[in-house]
Amino acid sequence: MFYSGENNLITDVDGILVGNAEDKEIGTGTTILIPPVGSTAAADVRGGAPGTREVGALNPYNLVDTIDAVVLSGGSAWGLEAASSAANYIGKSGRGFKTSENIKNVPMIPAAILFDLNNGGNKDWGDEPPYNNLGIEASTRASEKFQLGNVGAGYGAKAGSLKGGLGSASFENKEGLKIGGLFAVNSFGSVVNYETGQFWGASDELNNELSLIHI
């Protein structure tokens, strides 16, 4: 039997930190998840135009078997730059994949982006897209407590005709098993059952997170 975690956030899983950063003028943002050292990861890439970074390194047949962070970002292909600056920030502490002696460790930071270039923000950023700064800013803000909704990677997101955003949830059982999720929702189609006025996911809630919301 599972029940909601203490804060109903992915950071209820021990050792996980999350940070958000936004550029309100441009209408975009970045989110970083920093797990404990030695954490493993896997990826399932879907969609007609996915945008990812270092996902191939997660293949269990490959050499790298741990990650140092995961970055979610707006900005389409430009947003992947947020992971590069996050790698620089995290790498300063010496964290990363050890290749050999006397060579810098290489932070492993898979990333995925969403398309938010059509949300009306000022995308005329010239020679300096904002994602380098957003990656660093999100990294410096990483903590156990973080905001949801119109923040981070979800800042410029849409959910059909509605505003998208950043979501999170956690579950625990009596044996101490903890599961957490972090989502940047930028979906196509309707997220609402207009016959009931509720979100389609309301039937799967645990503590009335969605059933009290009517559109």
Where are these regions (language model features)?
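Alpha/propeptide regions of enzymes that mature by internal proteolysis
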Residues: 1-213
